[in-house]
């Protein structure tokens, strides 16, 4: 381990500001009102307001990574007679399918392939053919490839068919403008260490209160009981059922202040978009090709095909970039040899320019 700080070009954990890191230097008591009412309850309110101006929504914080919250929602929102249609076009949709299987939840997996956009007409046909489906679940920003999925169109279907709609917005909430009420989303799931630019330690769910209140007794897990966690926070002014990740929560509170200072989600989205466009243009100028067509890209992370040169090894490319202070992501696509570069977090235009210079220097197979 080195004391050097790298620029993380990843979809999270990501590079955070100095002030977000400094917020963790304070110790908090988990039952104290200054923490629970003064910090946790404020975060819950701010998250709900970021998600929608409509009434009837609430938020719940949950210890662990984003996947913990996804599993908590699936395990709590679906009753024993329910069935979920899971739209999958990457590792994170596939993970939801695996979770449902392990929990014994009835499900229909619509796998449209890793580089294909979900076919809304196909989803319509599935819903029309199977009236036992009660819920729809899908990923918004699928970081396996960098694809942005059509949550608006699927939300319209969910509304038309009267289905409960679950969206994994792990790598989009806080970085892409959305109104979850207008999108007909009943449960939105995200994490502290993504677009709001906090650090790892907890995830959160923003839910339609009426739906969440109906989850009592459904959970397949004690610690991942979303209803019980929500009731504890509601009844005890922000208190967590089990140990709260206090330092992570303080960092997140600071990150929310910095999001507002930047100009809110719209301004952050604009920065992320510009980062991603500059990255793609620069990489193409260096001879790299993107896995996806431009119209499918999210402004979060981009997958690039690996060079075909026999000398190329990702591990060596990665090492040379890391020596220059940049950390990128390996590929996660099963059928294509690629790597990924994220552009969220404390990453600005000058950082993308510096990264592209470093990549040119690291292209040892061209020398």
UniProtKB/Swiss-Prot annotation:
Any single GO molecular-function term of the entry would be: 2-aminoethylphosphonate-pyruvate transaminase activity
- The enzyme class is transferase
So which domain of life are we looking at? Bacteria
Catalysed reaction(s) here are: (2-aminoethyl)phosphonate + pyruvate = phosphonoacetaldehyde + L-alanine
Query: Where are the N6-(pyridoxal phosphate)lysine modifications?
Result: 194
Needed cofactors: pyridoxal 5'-phosphate
- Pfam families in the record: Aminotran_5
> Which keywords are on file for this protein?
Aminotransferase, Pyridoxal phosphate, Pyruvate, Transferase
State the function annotated in the UniProt record.
Involved in phosphonate degradation.
- Which NCBIfam families does UniProt cross-reference here? PhnW-AepZ, PRK13479.1, transamin_PhnW
The annotated subunit structure for this chain is:
Homodimer.
Q: What is this protein called?
A: 2-aminoethylphosphonate--pyruvate transaminase
Upper taxonomic lineage: Bacteria, Pseudomonadati, Pseudomonadota, Gammaproteobacteria, Enterobacterales
């Amino acid at each position: 381990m080195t004391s050097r700080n790298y620029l993380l070009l990843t979809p999270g954990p990501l590079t955070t500001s100095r002030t977000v890191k400094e917020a963790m230097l304070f110790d908090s008591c988990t039952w104290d009102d200054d923490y629970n009412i003064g910090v946790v309850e404020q975060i819950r309110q701010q998250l709900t307001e970021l998600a929608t101006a409509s009434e009837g929504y609430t938020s719940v914080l949950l210890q662990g990574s984003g996947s913990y919250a996804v599993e908590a929602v699936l395990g709590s929102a679906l009753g024993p007679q329910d069935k979920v249609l899971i739209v999958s076009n990457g590792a994170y949709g596939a993970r939801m399918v695996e979770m449902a299987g392990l929990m014994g939840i009835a499900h229909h997996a619509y796998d449209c392939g890793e580089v294909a956009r979900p076919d809304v007409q196909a989803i319509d046909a599935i819903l029309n053919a199977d009236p036992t489906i009660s819920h729809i679940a899908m990923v918004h920003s699928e970081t396996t490839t960098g694809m942005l999925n059509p949550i608006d169109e699927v939300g319209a279907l969910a509304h038309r068919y009267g289905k409960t709609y679950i969206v994994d917005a792990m790598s989009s909430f806080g970085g892409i403008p959305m109104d979850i009420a207008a999108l007909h989303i009943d449960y939105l799931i995200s994490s502290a260490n993504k677009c709001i630019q906090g650090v790892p330690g907890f995830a959160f769910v923003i839910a339609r209160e009426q739906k969440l209140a109906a989850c009592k007794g459904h959970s397949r897990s004690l610690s991942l009981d979303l209803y019980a966690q929500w009731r504890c926070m509601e009844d005890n002014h922000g208190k967590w059922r089990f140990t709260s990740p206090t330092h992570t929560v303080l960092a997140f509170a600071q990150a929310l202040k910095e999001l507002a200072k930047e100009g809110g989600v719209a301004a952050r989205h604009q920065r992320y978009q510009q980062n991603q466009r500059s990255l793609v243009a620069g990489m193409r100028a260096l001879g790299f090709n993107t896995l996806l067509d431009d119209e499918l890209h999210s402004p979060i992370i981009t997958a690039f095909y690996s060079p075909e040169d026999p000398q190329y090894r990702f591990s060596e490319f990665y090492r040379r970039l890391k020596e220059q202070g940049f950390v990128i992501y390996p590929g996660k696509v099963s059928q294509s040899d690629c790597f990924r570069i994220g552009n969220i977090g404390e990453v600005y235009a000058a950082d993308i320019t510096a990264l592209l210079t470093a990549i040119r220097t690291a292209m040892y197979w061209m020398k």
